[in-house]
A protein has these predicted regions:
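Beta-propeller folds
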Residues: 1-171
Length: 171
């Protein structure tokens, strides 16, 4: 069902550890500029579209239960981006962060934890990249500093234990 097309990259975005038959893959199918999220059944070789591509969204992210909840947008004419978020149980998306590309207001979501609306993300603090967490379901997002270093950027990816949904560290 997935055919190769020159220039079309796919990305496994979620291995769905609680599902032995499926993985989630980002691939441009319905929109040449924005990836769809498909559920690929690796045993039956079948696919199902989970999230159609949306103009301007270049990357999707799932929560720890395999639901598409975050989208990253980019506007090359304005050199700006935004992060959109879908609340658990809602069909509506809302912008939670706007930022300029390569500016100190940029934000990058690293992942979710067990709580469905809590994310860990990287952002600048005192001129260096640091790691924060926040409940993004709130209208006024209140960042909580997780870790920063006084002299250099923090290496930012989350580490998880296989049996836990909350991150256990960064590195």
């Amino acid at each position: 069902p997935l055919r190769w097309e020159e220039g079309n990259q796919t990305r496994i975005m979620d291995w769905l550890p609680d599902d032995d038959e499926n993985i989630l893959v980002m691939i441009r199918m319905s929109n040449a500029r924005s990836p769809d999220v498909i559920k690929l059944n690796v045993k039956k070789n079948s696919i199902k579209t989970v999230k159609k591509g949306v103009a301007g969204v270049g990357y999707w992210m799932t929560d720890e239960d395999g639901r598409v909840r975050i989208g990253n947008t980019y506007d090359r004419n304005r050199s700006s981006g935004s992060i959109i978020f879908q609340e658990e149980g809602s069909t509506k998306w809302r912008t939670i962060w706007d930022y300029s590309s390569f500016g100190e207001d940029s934000v990058s979501v690293l992942g979710f934890g067990k709580e469905p609306n809590k994310v860990w993300y990287e952002a600048y603090k005192d001129g260096r990249i640091a790691v924060f967490s926040a409940d993004i379901s709130k209208q006024n997002i209140e960042p909580e500093l997780v870790y920063s270093h006084p002299k250099r950027d923090v290496e930012t990816y989350l580490r998880y234990r296989k049996d836990k949904k909350d991150p256990i560290g960064i590195g």
